[in-house]
Amino acid sequence: VEFINDEVPFGFHIRNIHYHGSNAMVLLAVLHMYYQYFSGRYKIRNEVLWMTGVILGVVTILEAFTGYDVIFSERAELAISIAASLTTSIPVVGPTIRDAALGSGFSDFVLRFYAQHVFLLPIVMLGLMAVHFPRFLVFDVPMVMAIGGAILITGGVFPIDLGFKFEPTVPPGVTVPEWYLTGIYAFMRTQYDKFVTGLLWPLLFIIALVLIPFLDRYKKFSWRDRPMVTAFGITSLAQIMVTTYWGFYISPDVSIPLVERLVIDPIFFYGTMLLLVPLGFGFTYMMIKLANEAERKSK
């Protein structure tokens, strides 16, 4: 990667495009999902499209994750260590999954992650995309060109540093994973069971999203006419933003050991997460009340 970045003509631009494109891919997938969620599009007999979209979003994050890990920077090493500990924490089959995904040595790891990043996961994504939006792959060419152009410009204007190379003999510096993984990282830093915080909570959230079309029994599509569904969406968005921020936060007190600087107070953390539930529902009620009042006055 360093050779491509420093020696290949325009290699730095190619890498910048690749990096910004991967971040845009994850961000746009999340925004698209919540747009469909709040607009109730999944109610138009689109349950299969919604479920494939949720799965496609998860695979998109995995694709981005495997991509930035093959750089072998300090940030990549942290992400690889988290992945190894999470897969190992799975009861019974954990070690087997870890060995299958990460291999048993450096060369084996490189081969497996490159295969996942450039072959296995893209094939899965293409299959899901063919089911999820076959028509839009043809008719949304202008939008594809616009987003592609924006990424090309962004890659030229905002260069991305490779970061510090991971050295096994040198203690790593203070770093965090990419932004789309810092939420899970925040849960793990509460020092509760890794399987529960790093795998079970995200899995329950994904299952809840998959089941939304079958649980939403409201007849109308507007967010104002689906208060419980809207409240769940707003609360989940608030919790995602809070956990993402917390994943980036590291205590500025350099006088204490690094491990202690990374610890997040579980009582404060989970207390905040629980507090966001009534706040999310209260905010939803206020929004619906104001929207209905504005509609009444307009008539």
Where is each model-derived feature located?
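Membrane-embedded and interfacial regions of multi-pass energy-transducing membrane proteins
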Residues: 1-19, 24, 29-299
